[in-house]
Amino acid sequence: MIHKGHLKEGKSLLAPYLPTTSSTSPYSEGGALYGLGIIHANHGEGITQYLLSALNEHAASETIQHGACLGLGVAGMASGNRAIFNSLADVLNSDRAVAGEAAGIAIGLVMLGTGDEQALNLLIPYAHNTQHEKIIRGIAMGIALVMYAKEAKADSLIEQLLQDKVPIFLRAHSAILS
């Protein structure tokens, strides 16, 4: 958090850890992508293209994708950016537990407080179709973030989640209420 807001220097500060052709560690690289998103939190216009490229170029590494998803989520927070949403949806649809969990959370961050129907129509059915509990947890948090501050508009979704057979949705219910 010490570098949050250093938009101009962010990439150079993290350069030794960012993904390159001579890979160091996928954990360092994924963490650096997430850190880059934090530096550009809610001011991500200048870095989202880089993060989207990293997300697509490193599709073979769930760890790097995890960091890129979270970085995109934080950098594009509450932007409703459809390009980011679509890329995150592709990661979610790959049905890989680690990257999918981050994609679910990141979709919620990008669509924070929008109540976006398209996001909800992706997340809720997907949670029923996947066998990965990690993905379901990420989706539950994502749903809560999408419905952030929607108050009465969230009531029907809250009722739906209360009746749902997916127990983790009770967490989403609780988070939406808070």
Predicted regions and their residues:
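Alpha-solenoid helical-repeat scaffolds
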Residues: 1-178
